[in-house]
């Protein structure tokens, strides 16, 4: 758990409601209520919920973790479940949504190798939205290059939704790190000629328009 805060009676009550929920619907409601507090004190329980076989509760927990933000990252990364694929996939989605650069390695691996296309897509887009600006100046260029190189690789993914996510991530990176605009333009102008899916081709053209003149 982040910080030195003590669990308040209200948070304790909401945690207990999650732990004692006796139906899928009650569990979802209890998780939503706990997530709505946006309290770092809720992070351990929300992370535990990711292991449950309840997609509705997992979605609510992921949304809550994203709202809590950076304060959730230490616990999330320290408690990645290597034996429970579902929990790890949900945690990866949470990390992608939070945008903390500490998730770089996790998102790179997920974007390139996860067998679930929804996880690869979330990781790819999440890479492009990592807040590398929060890092020390001397680390920023290395992280930018890691993001760019990974997303260029992801553009070869066989699933169009994953390629779409990679293009969205690349666009945001180029908007924030302007020295990537020309390399990205060069890549996309070539890539669009090879892209078989019209919707991805349209996304590429939109990106070229959005990143604007050099």
Curated annotation (Swiss-Prot):
Respond yes or no to whether keyword Lyase is given for this record. Answer: yes
* Keywords, alphabetical: Antenna complex, Lyase, Phycobilisome
**Which regions form coiled coils?**
none
Show the GO MF annotations: lyase activity
Transmembrane stretches, by residue range? none
Q: Which GO terms describe its cellular component?
A: phycobilisome
Question: Which residues, if any, are the signal sequence?
Answer: none
Pfam families per the UniProt record, alphabetical: HEAT_2
Q: Which family does it belong to?
A: Belongs to the CpcE/RpcE/PecE family.
State its role: Required for the chromophorylation of the cpcA gene product.
Give the quaternary structure: CpcE and CpcF associate to form a lyase.
Q: What is this protein called?
A: Phycocyanin alpha phycocyanobilin lyase CpcF
| Organism the protein comes from | Synechocystis sp. (strain ATCC 27184 / PCC 6803 / Kazusa)
């Amino acid at each position: 758990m982040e910080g030195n805060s003590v669990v308040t009676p209200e948070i304790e009550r909401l945690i207990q409601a999650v732990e004692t929920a006796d139906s899928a619907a009650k569990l979802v409601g209890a998780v939503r209520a706990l997530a709505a507090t946006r309290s770092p004190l809720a992070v351990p329980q929300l992370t535990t919920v990711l292991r449950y076989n309840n997609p509705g509760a997992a979605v609510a927990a992921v949304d809550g973790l994203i709202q809590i933000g950076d304060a959730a990252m230490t616990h999330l990364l320290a408690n990645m479940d290597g034996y429970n694929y579902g929990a790890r996939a949900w945690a990866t989605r949470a990390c992608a949504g939070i945008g903390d650069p500490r998730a770089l390695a996790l998102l790179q691996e997920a974007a390139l190798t996860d067998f679930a296309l929804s996880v690869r897509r979330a990781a790819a887009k999440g890479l492009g939205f990592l807040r590398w600006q929060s890092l020390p100046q001397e680390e920023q260029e290395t992280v930018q290059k890691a993001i760019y190189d990974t997303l260029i690789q992801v553009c070869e993914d066989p699933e169009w939704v994953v390629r779409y996510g990679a293009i969205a991530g690349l666009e945001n990176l180029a908007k924030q790190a302007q020295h990537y605009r020309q390399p990205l333009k060069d890549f996309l102008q070539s890539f669009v000629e090879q892209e078989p899916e019209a919707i991805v081709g349209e996304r590429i053209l939109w990106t070229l328009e959005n990143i604007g003149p050099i």
